[in-house]
Amino acid sequence: PALIPAAAVAGRILASRGQTAKAAKIIQRTWSQSPHPDLAAAYAYARIGDSTHDRLDRIKQLALLKPHDVESGAAWASAAIDAREYAVARHALQPFIKTKLTRRVARLMARIELAEKNDAGRAREWMTRAATAAFDPVWTADGTA
């Protein structure tokens, strides 16, 4: 499915039935057209019992399908934070900090500062930047109900 919510739901259903490869293929195809956090979550958790490092490896593969998209960087960084791979998380976000800073990217940087260095001051600086950063892109339906 080309529709993001449909692809995410299909991926989750297929994964829950043990059809991980089919779920991954659907999510990858949709991600290549339009990266979205719901797709990243469905992809990361497609295999039950994966470690945080396994999920990081999976998300890295997904992110490399659209390496210059902020959603790829955010998904990769989030998985890296969960795996406590803070240098990887910083690397994933670096291309977006100066030119495409979004609220989520700044919040992820704040999480890194707190988790890696327990630096509340730097985390607050990132949260302040998040307040004035560009809004994150969101999926919306056209029309009215």
Describe the residue ranges of each PLM region.
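Alpha-helical adaptor scaffolds
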Residues: 25-98
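"A position-specific structural signal for the A-helix of alpha-solenoid helical repeats
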Residues: 8-9, 42, 75, 104-112
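Solenoidal tandem-repeat scaffolds enriched in leucines and small polar residues
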Residues: 1-4, 9
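Intrinsically disordered, acidic/Ser/Pro-rich low-complexity regions proximal to membranes
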Residues: 1, 14-17
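Start-of-helix register in tetratricopeptide repeats
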Residues: 5, 38, 71, 104-105
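TPR/TPR-like (Sel1-like) alpha-helical repeat modules
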Residues: 20-38, 97-103, 114-138
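Alpha-helical linker/edge segments of TPR/alpha-solenoid repeat scaffolds
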Residues: 46-62, 86, 115-127, 133-140, ...
